[in-house]
Amino acid sequence: MRKKPIGKLISHLYRRNQKILSKKLAPYGIGSGGQHSFLKLILQRPGITQEQLTNELKFDKATTARSVKQLEESGYIERKTDPNDRRSYLVSPTAKALEFAPVLQGILDELNVSLVHKLSEEEEDLIIDLLQKISIDPDE
């Protein structure tokens, strides 16, 4: 019998991770709710639509809209109406976001290291493989 359910352990790690991230990103005006995930994807794919953000990050539309609005108000992104679909917005990073990108990546890398610092390289590879294996959605 397991000491603790796997879901509970994953939830605990997620909450701890989010708490640390929120604290590290707050000075830059980036809040919780996955804003860093949205910004990272927008930096990787300038001109992505809000719908694509929703689908790729697997957030609901309301969370996407709220995060995009907050990132826009903080000056990290800009939204423009999609010329091919007037009901859709294209989201791109601003100069502020491009300048912040290495800082964001550094924070995320540092956090990742802190999560696995007690593991050997083999254990880290194994846990990544196992988490990816159980996170695959059978409906996709």
PLM features: what roles do these ranges have?
Residues M1-Y28:
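N-terminal leader segment of winged-helix/HTH proteins
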Residues G7-K8, G31-K40:
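Short alpha-helical elements of helix-turn-helix
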Residues Y14, K40-Q44, Q132:
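Short, locally clustered residues in the helix-turn-helix/winged-helix DNA-binding domain
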Residues I20, H36-K40, E99, L126:
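Pre-recognition alpha-helix immediately N-terminal to the DNA-recognition helix
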Residues L21-G31, V113-L119:
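Short amphipathic alpha-helical boundary/capping segments
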Residues K69-D129:
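Charged, amphipathic alpha-helical coiled-coil/dimerization segments
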Residues D125-E140:
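Exposed, interaction-prone assembly regions rather than primary DNA-binding/catalytic cores
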